[in-house]
């Protein structure tokens, strides 16, 4: 059960990450809330209670992630669950023929670096700390949950970088599950559809309504709390491993 678990949530200051940190804390887990120094992570951690600790982290930095894990070890003694919610997006066509301009390579690399390399960085370092845990009755020592996107499967115009970065997260899930199985560490990936996150909240109401109607059922945007609920379900179900779970209301994005 999630109660008394020690967790690390990246991207925990907003959106899916914040909802996850909030649910875990309410269920009695301890949370290392990791986000950029410029985020509202410190305020969020104070709001969520004494068992939530903010650590400033750039997920692409080995030093930052190692510091967050050391905080988990020093303050709570171990790490049971890592949830990778940190990420970024861009909307740029491969080539803009109207302006005769190609997609900037550095922008493509930045998205890959944060979403793919950053996720793997957190996974590999978390696994090292989890491996020191005493196994439970199933031999489990830890659980890792990643965040991909339906864009990994149904990428839209202008989403080459974002889709590639999330498809890589999908692709690494099974081999990492196999890598870590000998130490009793499970890993799953959640692929959200259209969710009521700060990014979508900034869109006009007319656009949000249109997007909601594109979802077969239920015809509404997903709530971050529903993502967080799935994180808890993955943690508490020992047979979920090496799997990618779409949470999208049967949405299949058309170009």
UniProtKB/Swiss-Prot annotation:
The EC number(s) this enzyme carries? 1.1.1.35, 1.1.1.51, 1.1.1.62, 1.1.1.-
Query: What GO cellular component entries does it have?
Result: mitochondrial ribonuclease P complex; mitochondrion
Where does it reside? Mitochondrion
The alphabetized list of GO BP terms reads: acyl-CoA metabolic process; androgen metabolic process; ecdysone metabolic process; estrogen metabolic process; fatty acid metabolic process; mitochondrial tRNA processing; steroid metabolic process
What broad class of enzyme is this? oxidoreductase
Q: Summarize the pH-dependence annotation from the UniProt entry.
A: Optimum pH is 9.3 for the dehydrogenase reaction, and 6.4 for the reductase reaction.
Residues annotated for NAD(+) binding in this entry = 14, 16, 35, 58-59, 85, 162, 166, 195, 197
The molecular function terms in GO held by this entry are: 3-hydroxy-2-methylbutyryl-CoA dehydrogenase activity; 3-hydroxyacyl-CoA dehydrogenase activity; 7-beta-hydroxysteroid dehydrogenase (NADP+) activity; acetoacetyl-CoA reductase activity; estradiol 17-beta-dehydrogenase [NAD(P)+] activity; isoursodeoxycholate 7-beta-dehydrogenase (NAD+) activity; steroid dehydrogenase activity; testosterone dehydrogenase (NAD+) activity
Q: Which domain of life is it from?
A: Eukaryota
Q: Has UniProt tagged this entry with the keyword tRNA processing?
A: yes
Q: Which CDD domains match?
A: HSD10-like_SDR_c
Q: What role is this protein assigned?
A: Mitochondrial dehydrogenase involved in pathways of fatty acid, and steroid metabolism. Versatile enzyme presenting two types of activity; L-3-hydroxyacyl-CoA dehydrogenase ((3S)-3-hydroxyacyl-CoA dehydrogenase) activity and hydroxysteroid dehydrogenase (HSD) activity with a wide substrate spectrum. As a (3S)-3-hydroxyacyl-CoA dehydrogenase, it functions in the third step of the fatty acid beta-oxidation pathway, a major metabolic process in which fatty acids are oxidized to provide a significant source of energy, while also generating acyl-CoA metabolites used by many metabolic routes. In addition to mitochondrial dehydrogenase activity, moonlights as a component of mitochondrial ribonuclease P, a complex that cleaves tRNA molecules in their 5'-ends. Essential for the structural and functional integrity of mitochondria. Function is essential for pupal development.
What interactions and quaternary structure are annotated?
Component of mitochondrial ribonuclease P, a complex composed of rswl/MRPP1, scu/MRPP2 and mldr/MRPP3.
Q: What is this protein's record name? A: 3-hydroxyacyl-CoA dehydrogenase type-2
Source organism of the structure: Drosophila melanogaster (Fruit fly)
> By which gene is this protein encoded?
scu
């Amino acid at each position: 059960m999630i109660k008394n678990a020690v967790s690390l949530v990246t991207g925990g200051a907003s959106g899916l990450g914040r909802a996850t940190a909030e649910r875990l804390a309410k269920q009695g887990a301890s949370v290392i809330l990791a986000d950029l120094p410029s985020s509202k992570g410190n305020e969020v951690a104070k709001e969520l209670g004494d068992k939530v600790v903010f650590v400033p982290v750039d997920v692409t930095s080995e030093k930052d992630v190692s510091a967050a894990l050391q905080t988990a070890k020093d303050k709570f003694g171990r790490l049971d669950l890592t949830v990778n919610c940190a990420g970024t997006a861009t909307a740029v066509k491969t080539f803009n023929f109207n302006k005769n301009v190609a997609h900037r390579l550095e922008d493509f690399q930045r998205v890959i670096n944060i979403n793919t390399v950053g996720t793997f960085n957190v996974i590999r370092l978390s696994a090292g700390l989890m491996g020191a845990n005493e196994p439970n009755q199933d031999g489990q020592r830890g659980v890792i949950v990643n965040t991909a996107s339906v864009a990994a499967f149904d990428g839209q115009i202008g989403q080459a970088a974002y889709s590639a970065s999330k498809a890589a997260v999908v692709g690494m899930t099974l081999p990492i599950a196999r890598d870590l199985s000998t130490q009793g560490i499970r890993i799953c990936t959640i692929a959200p559809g259209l969710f009521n996150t700060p990014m979508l909240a900034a869109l006009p109401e007319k656009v949000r309504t249109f997007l909601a109607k594109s979802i077969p059922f239920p015809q509404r945007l997903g709530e971050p709390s529903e993502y967080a609920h799935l994180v808890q379900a993955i943690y508490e179900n020992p047979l979920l491993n090496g799997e990618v779970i779409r949470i999208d209301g049967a949405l299949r994005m058309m170009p």
